[in-house]
Amino acid sequence: MRSGECDEEEIQAKQERDQNQNHQVNLNHMLQQQQPSSVSSSRQWTSAFRNPRIVRVSRTFGGKDRHSKVCTVRGLRDRRIRLSVPTAIQLYDLQDRLGLSQPSKVIDWLLEAAKDDVDKLPPLQFPHGFNQMYPNLIFGNSGFGESPSSTTSTTFPGTNLGFLENWDLGGSSRTRARLTDTTTTQRESFDLDKGKWIKNDENSNQDHQGFNTNHQQQFPLTNPYNNTSAYYNLGHLQQSLDQSGNNVTVAISNVAANNNNNLNLHPPSSSAGDGSQLFFGPTPPAMSSLFPTYPSFLGASHHHHVVDGAGHLQLFSSNSNTASQQHMMPGNTSLIRPFHHLMSSNHDTDHHSSDNESDS
């Protein structure tokens, strides 16, 4: 009897152990099934948020592993790099000497140390049809909340990959700064200690955005590229206004939505967009904070040209109460002559004004 009872107890204990083991195996299996999906989804989200150039290729579309790829001019490239034995030994020795936690940070340190030599290299050439190969990599929000701009096509002709403005093709931060517009694009820097992309001038960028918003309310500019080119050219114009003691203020207003006509002032013959006007006059109190004063290049004895209407030039002298009006060219789009030729063309414009008065 005792032997039979012992056998039954052993059988029951064994069954309980088997049930517990099966239950534990089922729980582990369920956790293993749920964990990869959540981890992979979170990794995909964070990777897409940090860098839009990181791409994950599914196994159904030819992907061979779970590691993500990066988009380059030669296509998708693996993030893992196989090193030779001597190179790997030197890399790990350098990691220990620098006190870095990851071998990849050694590569970041080497790239930063060689940034001057990298800047001297010729730029990469984009292959034909590069934007058609990866249409889903067009710059949208990409985690930074920025909208695409017309400077993308001008920075990278033939492509619409605006994310390349934020993520340089292996270049240093100095090269990346030349490719981007510093007033609208957030500059990023790689933190070697944390290994993350951080925003190191978010406050200054917000100040730039606030200035652009207030400026566009006073001087509407439909094309953001015209805003950049106009101020760039006005800087050259202001340098030439140093021949007289009269104060002249330079401003822009009413630039029309014609994206094909850019405002250029320093070339020999340039055109302004439809409805664009340039104002040169004494500095009002409200404008003194936005535009500094510069000496006028027009003397007190000269007639100051005022051209109103669509696409005309207006010059106001601080010594004259009234200004004569003259059309430089008929039509919606006018050609503005170089400003260093205005002094020599006074006789021609006066003769043209007398002809217009006789015709009227």
From Swiss-Prot:
One of its GO terms (biological process) is regulation of DNA-templated transcription. The keyword Nucleus applies. GO terms for cellular component: nucleus. It comes from the Eukaryota. It is found in: Nucleus. Keywords: Coiled coil, Developmental protein, DNA-binding, Nucleus, Transcription, Transcription regulation. Residues 63-121 form the TCP domain. Its main location: nucleus. The keyword Glycosyltransferase does not apply. PROSITE patterns: TCP (PS51369). Disulfide bonds: none annotated. Expressed in cotyledons, particularly in the vascular region, in leaves, buds, flowers and immature siliques. GO terms for molecular function: DNA binding; DNA-binding transcription factor activity. Residues 3-33 form a coiled coil. Pfam families: TCP (PF03634). Interacts with SPL. Plays a pivotal role in the control of morphogenesis of shoot organs by negatively regulating the expression of boundary-specific genes such as CUC genes, probably through the induction of miRNA (e.g. miR164). Participates in ovule development. PANTHER family: TRANSCRIPTION FACTOR TCP4-RELATED, TRANSCRIPTION FACTOR TCP5. This is Transcription factor TCP5. It comes from Arabidopsis thaliana. The gene is TCP5.
